[in-house]
Design a protein with these regions (language model features):
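Short S/T/G/P-rich N-terminal loop/turn motif that feeds into the first structured element of a domain
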Residues: 1-54, 62-69, 95-97
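An amphipathic, aromatic/His-enriched active-site/gating alpha helix that lines ligand/cofactor pockets
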Residues: 17, 60, 64-93
Length: 97
């Protein structure tokens, strides 16, 4: 099994809350559209600190191959294109368990 964790930090603008809610909503749609996803959890951070990220995705996949299939899936690519205008930093961790 593969665990895929992604943390996003969004630019501090007047639109930040709206953007985070839109990101969360769009992320939550992906499991119904991408069959490679086994487990999927999205959360908004409530801890305010300079080092904190705004939103986290924790997901599981059967293998490195299915994670790669997810990465290039048209619905995932569409999400990446959707968030490109307002994300400023992304951190990713993938590991086997």
């Amino acid at each position: 099994m593969i665990k895929h964790i992604v943390m996003f930090r969004v630019a501090d603008t007047a639109e930040k809350t709206k953007q985070l809610l839109a990101m969360k909503s769009e992320l939550e749609k992906l499991p119904s559209k991408i069959p490679q996803i086994i487990e999927y959890e999205v959360g908004l951070n409530f801890y305010i600190a300079p080092q904190a990220f705004d939103i986290v995705l924790v997901s599981s996949f059967e293998s490195k191959e299915t994670l790669q299939q997810y990465a290039v899936h048209p619905e995932h690519v569409k999400f990446i294109e959707f968030i490109n205008p307002f994300r400023i930093e992304v951190v990713v961790v993938d590991y086997e368990y």
